[in-house]
Curated annotation (Swiss-Prot):
Gene this chain is encoded by: bioF
Family: Belongs to the class-II pyridoxal-phosphate-dependent aminotransferase family. BioF subfamily.
Keyword tags: Biotin biosynthesis, Pyridoxal phosphate, Transferase
An individual GO BP term: biotin biosynthetic process
GO molecular function terms listed in the Swiss-Prot or TrEMBL record: 8-amino-7-oxononanoate synthase activity; pyridoxal phosphate binding
Subunit structure: Homodimer.
Protein name: 8-amino-7-oxononanoate synthase
EC number(s) reported in the record: 2.3.1.47
Amino acid sequence: MIRETLTTELAALKKQGLQRQRRTLQTPCGVRIEVDGRSLLSFCSNDYLGLAAEPTLIDAAREAALRWGVGSGSSHLVSGHFTPHEELEHKLASFVGGERALYFSTGYMANLGVVPALVGRGDAVFADKLNHASLIDAVQLSRADHQRYPHGDLTALERQLSASKAKRKLILTDAVFSMDGDLAPLTQLLELAERYDAWLMVDDAHGFGILGPQGRGTLVQYGIVLAEHPRLLYMGTLGKAAGVSGAFIAGAEEVIEWLLQRARTYIFTTASSPMLAATLLKSLDLIAGADGDARRSQLQLLIARLQDGLQGSRWQLLPSPTAIQAIIIGENDAALRVAAALAEQGLWVPAIRPPTVPKGTARLRITLSAAHSLADVDRLLAALQAAQ
């Protein structure tokens, strides 16, 4: 009976165009890849700076593996916290302007650990409706009252905050929204957090390494100094622009110490490999240096080329200043057909469907990388025009 039920539900997913399939890459992460025996130009990775296969980082990983091995063997609070972990946390805190940072295995685990450590029954979380799934799951796990406000609607958010009688309040938002590419109004959100005595947690998975001077993130882009706002928490991921793996939370000393004591996804899991932490130290040097500046400049050229090339065409991009450039198609089947047409021309652009995006907003999610060339973008533009 159980198997039959799942078989029926899987068939329903397939009929709705919602069944997902994995594609197996036979080459390292990059813009030119081999998938299922086919050579493709990829526009779907979050490797925004092209660091995932950067030779300098590969060399750093090799040296770190020889020095530290490949596993940690334990949780951070037992015997799995190594010198590279400690050095990375100090460097991350300094990089984003926080008092202290805590290194997690993934961004999903960071969000899932932080929210329930800060709020629970009797508290309230105010969340943008387009927040990442990990933030939604984190609120549900916390058992706090979950109030969602329309995307970017500060008036609605203030109305919810002013009416709340919760003991503790937490405003939760993506900094760069992963499926649209637009930015949250962080300055105004911080003002509301201060006015209504709430925490503000910012998930900068898609802004860290890209936005702000030296890629220091979306807070710095807005001129917000993390260390000056004890109620502010910052989450950044290290497997996208940084090209490696993991995530971190940065904020006030007391907040990070509390998370170390209470964030279950930090406490009760084996620590990430010290090899990865050591590699990330080198990645941060690249991000903050002249090489990182050159990669970010290249990314801006590519974004402008794509946006200019689609002006006046059938394909209208959502407004976004970031590497995430989305074209709304609408129906699931239509989005899949366009993605398939692009694949026929050797381009991998994924069709994103519900539940990742709201129903009726299936889209092509184009992600650009500094490893792309202008000629690569021109090839995509030509293929999109042909797909009309």
